[in-house]
Swiss-Prot record:
It is found in: Virion; Host membrane. Protein that is stored in high quantity in the viral capsid and may play a role during ejection. GO terms for biological process: symbiont entry into host cell. This is Cargo protein 1. The lineage of its organism: Viruses, Duplodnaviria, Heunggongvirae, Uroviricota, Caudoviricetes. The keyword Secreted does not apply. Homododecamer. Interacts with the portal protein. Its main location: virion.
Length: 842
């Protein structure tokens, strides 16, 4: 074989790895295998496990948002707030102490943590991943591990931002709803207080009697007015003309009208034109009765002629009328074509009625859409447009908005929606009393999804543990089993069970249609039950598959459905084995065979810098971090408003009604006059006897009159005192009750002030404690960082001393592991010298 000349770069020998050593970007073939050998397996697994835990913890920390339970509690308390004021003063006091909850949270308010902390977590995750990768795969493993750690931390960061935005939106929605409910509670209480004040004024207005003078002043005026109005309406219903002299005589019956049973013109006062130029007329043969013709000098008469001519379908009259008034073609042509051609005797009335009920801008064809009667029909393209205009739900506010719209179509739709809401306003059959015949299938058509619903779903009963059963819009319920609208039917299950629809809920809807038409048919019921059981079985099978797949993902050693065996690798499309990689590196021709490394058995020493790195990163994060006062803000956000109470004053007062003395005096006068007349009649003409009797009677009359006056005065005085005492007691009771309520409200306000003072004190103490802890943490991080730097410098100083000793020959090896030899007498011993033999003279 011919020798090939190898070009050298400079004076570097071609085989630069003959003596071993580290190489950048390449490792020996035993690097990966050594990491998982028996003696190194524990360290490798521990390093990887620790790195994975740290990376996962960094991602979770970056994705975590602040605790919003305090904000949610505030919203709930605001939503359930009840205004307890019973007077205007209490209402104003409670209104003054009430505060709206915040409803403009941004995603930064609920994000929690700080940017510096997340930066620190990201750097730490990347460092842990790089360290774990380096312990297994060298520099390439370090790069891979760093990328994995960095991706996990950044993914958690971005996921936390999205989660905070959704949470802020939800909190703002709940806060706005709570504020609206609180304002509604204030408005309702204000209306109730105003009504109670009116009742109190009415009770006190005539506490001592007197005419009320309501209405028009006459007693029973309002009742009589309503009675007369009802009589008037009754007369109108009976076709009585109440304003005419014969208003109490009914009009003639309909069969006495000139109903043209035998034909004739609609009006006798017609202009027949001149003899030379008479108006076109309808001959008598075209009418129901003879001896009449009908001129058509005007369009109104022409319309009448068209209607009358249509009785017999006379085309000649129709042509005459339309020749004189061509404009009636668009009005009456198609109408009477359909009338004549479709059994006029049955549909004439409906056709005319539909024409006169049409709106001016509609055409005659539009007037004929309901000429045969039936339900109201809405075009398919127009269905749901007004509901969409209202945002999915038609309300009174949306109807008012639509009726005030500048678009005439929107106004018509709003009017139709308003009328449709009153179709059952006066009652109707609600399918009660056993008349609700269903097949047992329930459709959940409203409520939104579990994520959209503020109550996490629509409750349908509770389970044996008391937890509510929640469903969402789109699902179908049958026999306490819910068919999901989220789970899509796999193709193999759809073919096996012969299901229709994309989801199991749609399949259930399709399967129940036949039974919906015949809910009481036993065969349909059995078929429905069998179909639902088949769909339920298919859904359970699909759910079991999903659970099995989820369990396989939870335990990486199980690959029942396949998957990536190394989720943290590079996921190469064409993976290679270690032997293939070694062969590829040998064949590259750039370098020689990599010699085995001589220091593979040495332990890692770079971890001794971990405390310094950690303290440095913590100190770096302190530059961007701020103390977290969320707990203190949670306490300060609690509403400590005063609770006000009210009282209901008693309006039960007595009226003073004195004894009517004049009534009894008149009675006595009548009795005395009768006595005198009787004495005079029985005296027999003897004036002395009459005079004596009259004097005695008058004496008794005077005595009785005096007794009546005195006793009546005493009775009235006692009655006045009793009435005043009773009313005084009522006023005292009302005053005492109001005083107690005022005292309670004052004490409640004072207690609220003391509570707010305690709240402010607690918040200040918490904030100061948090501030002190933050300062101590910063000081500890800086102290540890400086202490670590000092320890590292002291270690380097000692290493320099050892290197100096090794260099001077005292030690045979320096701190880098290099052999330095040392002096020949380094081990000590006896010094041997050459001595002369013989006798020596001194």
């Amino acid at each position: 074989m011919a020798k090939k000349k190898i070009k050298r770069r400079g004076k570097m020998p071609p085989n630069i790895f003959d003596t071993g050593g580290q190489s950048w970007g390449q490792q020996s073939s035993g690097q990966f295998s050594n990491a998982f050998k028996g003696e190194n397996l524990g360290n490798s697994i521990g390093s990887i496990g620790g790195a994975v835990g740290g990376i996962a913890q960094a991602g979770i920390s970056n994705a975590q948002i602040a605790d919003t339970s305090g904000i949610e509690a505030q919203n709930k308390a605001q939503k359930n707030m009840v205004v307890g004021a019973s007077s205007n003063d209490d209402l104003m006091s409670e209104w003054g102490s009430w505060n709206k909850v915040k409803d403009d949270y941004s995603w930064k308010d609920v994000r929690g943590g700080s940017t510096g902390q997340r930066v620190t977590n990201t750097i730490g995750a990347a460092g842990q991943g790089a360290a774990a990768g380096a312990s297994v795969g060298g520099p390439i493993g370090a790069i891979v591990g760093g990328v994995v750690g960095l991706g996990s931390a950044i993914g958690g960061w971005l996921g936390g931002n999205r989660k905070a935005k959704r949470k802020a939106k939800k909190l703002n929605k709940e806060a706005k709803e709570a504020n609206e409910r609180a304002l509604t509670s204030f408005e309702t209480r204000a209306d109730n207080i105003d009504t109670q004040n009116d009742f109190n004024m009415l009770a006190n207005f005539s506490a001592y009697g007197g005419p009320l003078e309501f209405g028009s002043g006459a007693i029973g005026y309002e009742f009589d007015n309503r009675y007369l109005n009802n009589q008037e309406m009754s007369a109108v219903a009976k076709q009585r003309l109440t304003s005419l002299p014969n208003s109490f005589q009914a009009l003639p019956e309909m069969n006495t009208y000139n109903a043209f049973a035998e034909g004739g013109g609609l009006s006798r006062e017609k202009n027949y034109g001149s003899k030379k130029k008479p108006y076109p007329s309808v001959p008598s043969g075209d009418f129901a009765g003879p001896h009449r013709s009908y001129p058509i000098p005007t369009k109104a008469d022409a319309r009448d002629a068209l209607r009358l001519a249509g009785l017999h379908g006379n085309e000649s009259v129709r042509r005459k009328v339309l020749a004189k008034y061509p404009s009636l073609k668009a009005f009456g042509g198609s109408l009477f074509d359909s009338v004549v051609g479709n059994n006029f005797n049955q549909s004439f009335t409906q056709g005319i009625q539909g024409m006169f009920q049409q709106e001016p801008e509609q055409t005659v064809q539009a007037a004929n859409i309901a000429k045969d009667g039936g339900d109201i029909k809405i075009k398919e393209k127009n269905k749901g447009k007004f509901t969409a205009y209202c945002g999915g739900k038609v309300t009174e506010a949306c109807i008012r908005k639509g009726k005030n719209s500048s678009n005439p179509t929107t106004r018509k739709r709003a009017t139709f929606a308003q009328n449709a809401r009153n179709w059952n306003a006066f009652g109707g059959w609600l399918n009660t009393q056993g008349g609700d015949f269903t097949n047992g299938v329930t459709f959940i058509n409203e409520g939104g999804s579990h994520e959209e619903n503020p109550y996490q779903g629509i409750q349908i009963g509770v389970d044996p543990e008391g937890a509510p059963n929640l469903v969402e819009q789109g699902e179908v319920v049958y026999d306490d089993y819910v068919f999901s609208d989220r789970m899509e039917i796999p193709d193999d299950i759809r073919k096996e069970y012969k299901l229709r629809g994309k989801t199991f809920a749609k399949a259930a809807k399709s399967a129940q249609r036949e039974s919906e038409e015949r809910p009481n048919d036993p065969l349909s019921t059995k078929g429905l039950q069998a179909a639902m059981e088949r769909i339920a079985t298919a859904q359970e099978e699909a759910r079991q598959r999903k659970e099995a797949h989820r369990e396989g993902n939870e335990y990486p050693s199980m690959f029942a459905y396949g998957g990536d065996t190394n989720p943290y690798g590079l996921a190469l499309e064409d993976p290679m084995s270690v032997e293939e990689l070694e062969a590829l590196m040998v064949q590259s021709g750039e370098t020689g065979e990599i010699a085995p490394e001589g220091n593979n058995g040495n332990r890692q020493t770079w971890t001794r810098y971990a405390p310094i790195i950690g303290s440095g990163l913590a100190s770096l994060s302190d530059l961007f971090s701020k103390p977290d006062y969320d707990s203190a803000d949670l306490i300060s956000g609690v509403d400590l408003g005063a609770e006000a109470v009210g009282y209901a004053p008693i309006g039960n007062y007595l009226s003073y009604r004195p004894l009517d003395r004049d009534f009894y005096i008149n009675k006595m006068n009548q009795q005395a006059a009768a006595t005198r007349r009787g004495l005079m009649n029985t005296s027999g003409g003897n004036r002395l006897n009459a005079q004596a009797g009259i004097l005695a009677a008058d004496y008794n009359y005077g005595q009785n009159m005096g007794n009546l006056a005195r006793q009546a005065e005493e009775y009235n005085q006692q009655l006045r005192e009793r009435v005043e005492a009773f009313n005084r007691g009522t006023n005292m009771f009302n005053t005492e009750t109001g005083l107690k309520a005022s005292m309670f409200n004052a004490e409640s306000r004072n207690a609220a002030k003391r509570a707010r003072l305690g709240q402010a004190t607690t918040v200040a103490q918490l904030r100061q404690g948090i501030k002190d802890q933050d300062a101590a943490r910063r000081s500890a991080n800086i102290t540890n960082f400086l202490q670590g730097l000092g320890d590292m410098g002291w270690e380097n100083e000692q290493a320099n001393w050892l290197d100096t000793l090794a260099k001077s020959g005292v030690l045979k090896m320096n701190t880098k592991g290099e052999y330095t030899g040392g002096t020949k007498k380094a081990k000590g011993g006896k010094v041997r010298t050459k001595k002369k033999k013989g006798l020596t003279y001194g």
